[in-house]
Amino acid sequence: MLRRNPTAIQITAEDVLAYDEEKLRQTLDSESTTEEALQKNEESTRLSPEKKKIIRERRIGITQIFDSSMHPSQGGAAQS
């Protein structure tokens, strides 16, 4: 098996700065994503119990079977 000489890598100060800037940008992006998630969590904890119930029912697909205008006790079209 043949061996070849290792490739020499030269890193300049500009390369280091570019790397540091990229790492800083990634850190800031992840922090902003974390902050957005925390804000969404805070919003959901501030909702009233009734609003939470409505949101939950919409999320899992529960719908009201009778429209209030069709309910017999409210004088809707379904009267006999």
Swiss-Prot record:
Component of the anaphase promoting complex/cyclosome (APC/C), a cell cycle-regulated E3 ubiquitin-protein ligase complex that controls progression through mitosis and the G1 phase of the cell cycle. The APC/C is thought to confer substrate specificity and, in the presence of ubiquitin-conjugating E2 enzymes, it catalyzes the formation of protein-ubiquitin conjugates that are subsequently degraded by the 26S proteasome. Has a role in assembling cut9 in the 20S APC/cyclosome. One of its GO terms (biological process) is positive regulation of exit from mitosis. Residues 26-54 are annotated as: Disordered. GO terms for cellular component: anaphase-promoting complex; cytosol; nucleus. The keyword Acyltransferase does not apply. Keywords: Acetylation, Chaperone, Ubl conjugation pathway. It comes from Schizosaccharomyces pombe (strain 972 / ATCC 24843). Residues 37-54 have a biased composition (Basic and acidic residues). This is Anaphase-promoting complex subunit hcn1. The gene is hcn1. The modification N-acetylmethionine is found at M1. InterPro entries: APC_suCDC26. The APC/C is composed of at least 13 subunits: apc1, apc2, nuc2, apc4, apc5, cut9, apc8, apc10, apc11, hcn1, apc13, apc14 and apc15. Interacts directly (via N-terminus) with cut9.
